[in-house]
Amino acid sequence: MSSSSEPTKFKMVVVGAGGVGKSALTIQLIQNHFVEDYDPTIEDSYIKQVVVDGAICILDILDTAGQEEYSAMREHYMRTGEGFLCIFAVTSLKSFQEIDNFRTQALRVKDADKVPMVLVGNKVDLPKRDVSTKDGNDKALSFGIPYVETSAKTKQGVEEAFFTLVREILADRRNQEGQKKSDSKRAKFKCTLL
């Protein structure tokens, strides 16, 4: 991160099917509070200052609607995001299967083969699981992204999920910087054959 004491900003977008706990996870991180009632989100924005790996970070988190009818709005929000938390409920196989669509949408909107992303299996505090830890790990491995299991209710893994995304965004920024330097070196040393 930056060597100065100036906080670094990270624009995150939280995506996933309706009812998987996107808002509950975000509110748990921001306000240290668990929301019991399900109130479908259209769009909410949150900002929180945290310390990740000794550096001050500003998390700018956009909590999006999971319902399909808001897909066009979600695309607009995805354009501004640097990284994505793709959340499913371990109690819902359907929400797990829908993650592929959210990932594909993010890649298409960002016009990239890879974007900073973390797969999050939420609601691990509930006794009935339809998605195993192995299934979550396997999907994350196939995407080439980290996997974190969480519970908005017990706080398990909440910071880990968001902080892992910070690290993924940082790695992507470093990779892009390295690519720019490499491209500029190639531009400076062109050979001319006579």
From Swiss-Prot:
A Pfam family assignment: Ras
InterPro entries on file: P-loop_NTPase (IPR027417), Small_GTP-bd (IPR005225), Small_GTPase (IPR001806), Small_GTPase_Ras-type (IPR020849)
Enzyme Commission code: 3.6.5.2
PROSITE patterns: RAS
Lipid moiety-binding region (S-geranylgeranyl cysteine): 191
Entry's localization field: Cell membrane
Catalytic activities: GTP + H2O = GDP + phosphate + H(+)
Activity regulation behaviour: Alternates between an inactive form bound to GDP and an active form bound to GTP. Activated by a guanine nucleotide-exchange factor (GEF) and inactivated by a GTPase-activating protein (GAP).
Propeptide: 192-194
Top-level EC class as recorded in UniProt: hydrolase
Record membrane topology: Lipid-anchor
Binding site for GTP: 16-23, 63-67, 122-125
Top-level division of the source organism's lineage: Eukaryota
GO molecular function, one term: GTP binding
Residues carrying Cysteine methyl ester: 191
Family (UniProt): Belongs to the small GTPase superfamily. Ras family.
Function: Ras proteins bind GDP/GTP and possess intrinsic GTPase activity.
Protein name: Ras-like protein RAS1
Organism: Hydra vulgaris
